[in-house]
Amino acid sequence: MAITNGNVGSGQTVDVLTVPAGKTYAITSVLITNTGSEDPTGGQDSRFYLYAVTGSYTANNSMIVNNAVLPGAETFTLDTEKLVLAENDKLKVSVSGTNSASVVVSYLEV
């Protein structure tokens, strides 16, 4: 099992994982954490999108999570099913709002 991680700033869309040529990966989990502090008023909330992209990037055709609210200091976990990506496929994360997000992806080569 391997992991990759990165930081996605507010207003950015980042490729958090790109499958190399000749490889296939099974994504076992994706963790997205709001780097802001806990704030019951919602002042540290951010929103995020998660995409699995093949070929050209088309948001409406590749969206896994759509504009989800991620409160300050909270973590979203996607781990109920494996997501299989072939060579050149990508996982992208887009963040908007007050804070950046830390993203960790766990995967297996298959």
Describe every region a protein language model picked out:
Residues S37-N66:
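Short, surface-exposed beta-strand/strand-loop-strand elements in extracellular ectodomains
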Residues N34-T41, E81-V84:
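Short linear motifs in intrinsically disordered
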Residues Y49-A52, I64-N66, D79-E81, S94-V95, ...:
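Beta-strand-rich, repetitive solenoid scaffolds
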Residues S56-N88:
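Intrinsically disordered, low-complexity Pro/Gly/Ser/Thr-rich segments with frequent PxxP/GP/PP motifs
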Residues M1-S29, N34-T35, T54, E87-N88, ...:
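C-terminal interaction-tip segments
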